[in-house]
Amino acid sequence: MSEGFSSSSIQELYQSLKEITNNADVELFEDRITKLDFESTDEPKHANDIIKDRFLRPSNALPWSLLDMVQDVPHTSSPEDCSGKLDYKELLKVPDPINRTSYQFKRTGLEGKISGYKEEVDLKEVANANASNSLSITRSINHNQNSVRGSTAQLPFTPGGIPMKSVKTDSEQNGSSTMANATKLLHKDGQGLFDIPEGMNRGIKPMDSPAENEDQNGQFKELKQLNEIDNELDIRIEANEAKLKEEEKSAKSISEEIMEEATEETTADNADDAEIDELLPIGIDFGRTKPVSKSVPVKKEWAHVVDLNHKIENFDELIPNPARSWPFELDTFQKEAVYHLEQGDSVFVAAHTSAGKTVVAEYAIAMAHRNMTKTIYTSPIKALSNQKFRDFKETFDDVNIGLITGDVQINPDANCLIMTTEILRSMLYRGADLIRDVEFVIFDEVHYVNDQDRGVVWEEVIIMLPQHVKFILLSATVPNTYEFANWIGRTKQKNIYVISTPKRPVPLEINIWAKKELIPVINQNSEFLEANFRKHKEILNGESAKGAPSKTDNGRGGSTARGGRGGSNTRDGRGGRGNSTRGGANRGGSRGAGAIGSNKRKFFTQDGPSKKTWPEIVNYLRKRELLPMVVFVFSKKRCEEYADWLEGINFCNNKEKSQIHMFIEKSITRLKKEDRDLPQILKTRSLLERGIAVHHGGLLPIVKELIEILFSKGFIKVLFATETFAMGLNLPTRTVIFSSIRKHDGNGLRELTPGEFTQMAGRAGRRGLDSTGTVIVMAYNSPLSIATFKEVTMGVPTRLQSQFRLTYNMILNLLRIEALRVEEMIKYSFSENAKETLQPEHEKQIKVLQEELQTIEYKSCEICDNDIEKFLELMLAYKEATVNLMQEMVKSPSILHILKEGRLVAFRDPNDCLKLGFVFKVSLKDAVCVIMTFTKPYKLPNGEPNHLIYFPKADGYRRRNFPKFQKTDFYMEEVPVTAIEVITKRKFAAPLGKVIKKDVAALNEFNAETNNILDGKTLKEAINIEKQGLKIHQILLDRTNIRDEIFKLKSIKCPNLSQHIVPKFKAHVIKKKIEELYHLMSDQNLSLLPDYEKRLAVLKDTEFIDQNHNVLLKGRVACEINSGYELVLTELILDNFLGSFEPEEIVALLSVFVYEGKTREEEPPIVTPRLAKGKQRIEEIYKKMLCVFNTHQIPLTQDEAEFLDRKRFAMMNVVYEWARGLSFKEIMEMSPEAEGTVVRVITWLDEICREVKTASIIIGNSTLHMKMSRAQELIKRDIVFAASLYL
């Protein structure tokens, strides 16, 4: 720039600047920093260098004049001046705090001019961010041993979408959102700076310098002037130019030339800007300053329903390079899902079973492989995880598939990891480094969020997942997919695309089986055939009529009818007497749910099949090629029983028998020889070789898997299964049969829900093999109820409902990590979705009310102004006392004596207008009163209600403020008792009923009485203090005191008080509404907050946390216990209770926490005295914890409440002998449970042993650690821990 000037012009500029500086008459440079102190020189080159140094070359060092302003020079004194005294204050230095904020410039325009500054919280400045001090996704990676499972010593990653207190979230570090969320809870001053530190009531209060004290703030002025030095220089040059113009009018000064050149440059720049603006799009707004108004947040819809009523013709153009392709054309809903995944969105796919939801999951897995990221596939149960592992291994050749369960880790570094939701929850709380690489989380069978025990885990996982993770939710059809997706979207601040299809790939045809006849009732177009339904009733009623005529439309012996005589199992059709039931199945049904028994007056049983029923229907379906079939039976015992009834029926030829035999032999080679001959395996083998099988929770895991694999290969033609078979297992069949549409759910018999029926019926119909799926509902001896049948088969599926509840493990984990508060977890749960969705609407209402508050005008009055605020306060207190009085009066029997028919009362209508009327009737139950009103609403001349209290005895006050009520024709009005303001002693003697009937004499008396009242005579209250109970007496006393205080005020004598109080009262009402809205938006309105506070009190009392909610040693141990009963187990561990037992005794005692127990059978005696002593100690500790729970009124789950009554110690002997080395066959001889239950209990015990072992490390108990390791070794053997056939 300087090279554009000649040497002579530079010399002239130099001389001109010297003259400006040295001229005493022109005081342009007032501050010492910017004063131009030039040395005298005549050399042009030297002058050029000085100007360059001064203006063009920025210095790396600050001038001393500026440094003196921002630094303190320590006071130094000579030894002679010390006088032997030391200044100890010099030693009391407060160390500099860690500064987690930084100042950022606000820039505007394309040039990036600085327009202001802002202060932001920034964790990137924290040195050495790691898993123990940072929630950032960019923190340093921890040890490899914790990369998969994480550790309780680690913090989780920042949950996505949730504004964190004083924490900069990962999304903000990536620049995808503003700091408003992260710092909205910190207070800022007028300049936008944080002035009150978190946790303190007050902070820095800088002194604002008034205008008259500008000289005292010169240093701050100099800093400000330093930032504006360029502008000041321009101003001074302009001033100098004006002076030179006066002296040399004919010649131009150097300064003027400079200014002209600068103006020319500016004009050229503006011309360039205009050319650039022509090239830029009109709507461009980056880098431009825009006026920002503090608008009310608009309610944003995060869920977007995708329209499927179209075909995507250009799918190949939209997805030119798909991550995966299929040999068949995708359905529209699958294409939409794939498209949105490629766009980086999250999707919620709701479709029927076998509709092809798995395609979406497969595409996400392939996409993650292509992007070199990971996918996590979560399933509701471990068995489904194993099956999905096998399916995906067969589906993908190029993608690594891994499995993580409680006891197995296969290929944990794979691109796709399959696990249960509980495992993922644990990984999130423990900050597993593996989460960094996850791009997709697939939630399969989302409708299991309705599960009462495990639904809360799904919500926790969704809330805790980091921002970068995308969601793929797969579910059966549910009515509120949009609501659920909108909750996830709002919580995670992500758009969720809802793709819901009611279409079935294979339509269903629902039939009823009645007396060897298959009757279609609902066709494949979902049309109900009522004539056919009546036909099934006629068939069954016709058979029943041999014994007794039918009297009900629903048929005899149904769920709500008396049992009819006659059945299918006896020769004479009358049923047998003297058997276990009198009637029962043989007698045509039951009374209600059962029949009259021979020994007891009422014995309930179900209308069920005979031994011929299943052979008949199997042969019928076999002839019509409707096999294979699955029969859903809601009892393990009946599954086995019904399979036994098919003895003699064989579905397999010799070749199939040979293949089944070879597969079984190959599968059980992993078992010990003695385990291969277990009764259950031998029986299952004999059934399988005939093409028949059973599937329920009592089977050994290896037997269940063996049956599932053979069924998928088509070897099993008839399968009797419980409803767990329908839980996600991809095993379609030709026909599904319901042995009943009622089941026992643990509490009692009930009908199946439409969702349960749809889930099980959806197994019917194999895509590509069957044109329709056949569903059969069994009707044995009694016809089905049409209403029940329609509701179950065609009803609306169960809505997704939150099962969110607080657990101690969750509370302690959140208190441990401190970043996410428990209140926030509750706030963002699905249970609070409705309230949170209304928050933008509440904020909008608050803004409207605040604006309305600003428009209220207050009139000045010499009488009122001094104490009208006090009057309003006392008036509101008096009104509140009156409401409390009436609430208590309703509970008191005296109300009936006071509020008798004809009693004159003054009451308020919904608009707060006063009216007079006679009591006609009172309902104490509903706390309402019917009043015969005879006055118009009392209003002020301007139409506003008169809010003042109606004091009937104060004549002067009453005449000023309630001069005259206007009479009207009487009418009846129902008002709450609390709306009554005054109950007078006056009573209308004649019956009001006659007045209503327009009796002339009664009407005349009524008119005379009302005219007398309206003449303004003094009225007295009917409630006497002396005759009331203690509580009412106290309220009346308080109210009288308030009244006396009111009449001491000066404003009570104001003639216009009723008008002057209106704006004050209106402002009070608006403020109250605003407070209510703020309360609705606050954490104090959370429905689970009282429960949280009670549980906090429990944790404090039991010393899991301290008074400041810091997690203590007990709490850290409880964080490790995820299997339930964490408080009791922690007490056992820290009490060193387990340390005094041997490993085999420890696992036996711990079995009480995994075995659910039974209530009917008695517990077997404990085998050793030591175990008996351990049992007694566990009961003592549990009773102690129950006392604490009861003290704080903690709501308990059914399992927690019945822990001591369900005989949970019944498995103790079995586990003890297993740990001692007995074979599985031997322990089954003493087991009260089936083989599958025993295996499940021992498997869960291994998980508890692992958790206790980790807890022992925390407390430093090496002996317990060794014992728990030994205990795991003792139980992990043989058939219980045999490898899965899917792995």
UniProtKB/Swiss-Prot annotation:
Segments of skewed composition (Gly residues): 555-567, 585-595
PROSITE patterns membership: HELICASE_ATP_BIND_1, HELICASE_CTER
GO biological process: defense response to virus; mRNA catabolic process; nuclear-transcribed mRNA catabolic process; nuclear-transcribed mRNA catabolic process, 3'-5' exonucleolytic nonsense-mediated decay; nuclear-transcribed mRNA catabolic process, non-stop decay; regulation of translation
Reactions performed catalytically: ATP + H2O = ADP + phosphate + H(+)
Motif DEVH box, chain ranges: 444-447
Keyword Flavoprotein listed: no
Record-stated family: Belongs to the helicase family. SKI2 subfamily.
SMART domains for this protein: DEXDc (SM00487), DSHCT (SM01142), HELICc (SM00490)
Domain annotation Helicase C-terminal: ranges: 638-815
Function: RNA helicase component of the SKI complex involved in 3'-mRNA degradation pathway. Represses dsRNA virus propagation by specifically blocking translation of viral mRNAs, perhaps recognizing the absence of CAP or poly(A). Essential for cell growth only in the presence of M1 replicon.
Region (Disordered): 540-608
Keywords: Antiviral defense, ATP-binding, Cytoplasm, DNA-binding, Helicase, Hydrolase, Nucleotide-binding, Phosphoprotein, RNA-binding, Translation regulation
UniProt subcellular location: Cytoplasm
One MF term in the entry's GO annotations: DNA binding
Residues where Phosphoserine is found: S209
Recorded GO CC terms: cytoplasm; Ski complex
EC id: 3.6.4.13
Other comments on record: Present with 5770 molecules/cell in log phase SD medium.
Subunit note: Component of the SKI complex composed of at least SKI2, SKI3 and SKI8. The SKI complex interacts with SKI7, which makes the link between the SKI complex and the exosome in order to perform mRNA degradation.
Protein name: Antiviral helicase SKI2
Residue segments, region RNA-binding RGG-box: 556-577
Positions annotated to bind ATP: A351, H352, T353, S354, A355, G356, K357, T358
InterPro entries (UniProt xref): DEAD/DEAH_box_helicase_dom, Helicase_ATP-bd, Helicase_C-like, MTR4-like_stalk, P-loop_NTPase, RNA-DNA_Helicase, SKI2-like, Ski2/MTR4_C
Domain Helicase ATP-binding: start-end pairs: 338-496
